[in-house]
A protein has these predicted regions:
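Short, conserved secondary-structure transition motifs
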Residues: 1-6, 162-164
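Extended glycan-interaction surfaces of carbohydrate-active proteins
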Residues: 4-112, 140, 144-146
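Non-catalytic C-terminal accessory modules of carbohydrate-active enzymes
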Residues: 83-86, 102-105, 109-110, 116-245, ...
């Protein structure tokens, strides 16, 4: 509530500071691509929305509108250059309504794949799939195997760890969530399809078709107390080992009230 009351400017979250030029490396009224990082982590860990969902969507749309560039030909960056020329990317920050500090935070004009994945993941969780795909397609066009290796997303060095934020895209698209204390494996995909999943002791593939789920275990042992698909519990009474598949799991019928 305090974050909303103090930092919300009607479109996105900002930094409140008396004089943005009194200290180096601030951003003030700028649109920060990282402004929903806490929401990103909350979603990955099954905590849902920690700020108002409508404000999440508004802030995400502001990030895409103001920070995404389809072509960086006219963009100036005096720091590291991870995207250039007619390539596109998501800037770490922008000041569409002015107010750029005299010395903004370092790297503000750069493009980081890890932040692009993080923003795209949060967009998926917020139901903004088209915007998420825009960010990811722009990124993938830079790493298409022509100028850069698709297996090495470079930031401050080769194979930089922040790009592992891309795993969040899988979790957001599949709605996969493993609750270890409750031993519950849940799926809430944005659409039907096949998805990878992991638990503490198993990994494999999940196939979702409507209210039907089939699990294929590729490694380890899946020993869950409960399987949930789109909020409804599915029957799975026995553990599954590597090489095994479940039957097609369906929720029990909802009891009909007798007239």
């Amino acid at each position: 509530e305090a974050m909303d009351a103090v930092l919300w400017n009607g479109e996105h979250y900002r930094q409140v500071i008396d004089d943005v030029d009194a200290h180096r490396y601030q951003y003030g009224e700028g649109v920060l691509s990282d402004q929903l990082l806490g929401q990103f982590h909350a979603r990955l860990n099954g905590l849902g929305d920690i700020v108002d969902p409508e404000r999440v969507r508004s802030a995400l749309r502001a990030i895409v509108t103001h920070n995404h560039r389809a072509d960086l030909t006219g963009h100036e960056s005096t720091q590291r250059v991870y995207a250039l020329g007619d390539e596109g990317g998501l800037l770490l920050a922008s000041w569409p309504r002015g107010g750029r500090p005299a010395i903004p935070f370092v790297y503000s004009d750069e493009v980081w794949t890890g932040v692009e994945h993080q923003v795209a993941t949060t967009l998926l969780y917020a139901g903004l799939a088209d915007e998420a795909l825009l960010i990811e397609r722009t990124l993938r066009s830079r790493y298409d195997g022509t100028a850069r290796s698709p297996w090495n997303e470079i930031e401050c060095g080769n194979h930089y760890a922040r790009s592992l934020a891309s795993w969040g895209l899988l979790l957001a698209a599949s709605g996969a969530q493993w609750d270890a204390p409750a031993r519950t494996l849940s799926f809430d995909p944005i659409d039907d399809g096949a998805f990878l999943f992991t638990t503490d002791r198993a990994w494999g593939r999940a196939e979702v078709h409507g209210d039907e789920l089939t699990l294929h275990i590729d490694g380890g042992i899946l020993d869950a107390d409960q399987i949930v698909l789109r909020g409804r519990a599915l029957p799975l009474s026995e553990p599954l080992a590597a090489g095994q598949s479940s039957p097609a799991l369906r929720p029990d019928p909802i009891p009909q009230e007798t007239p």
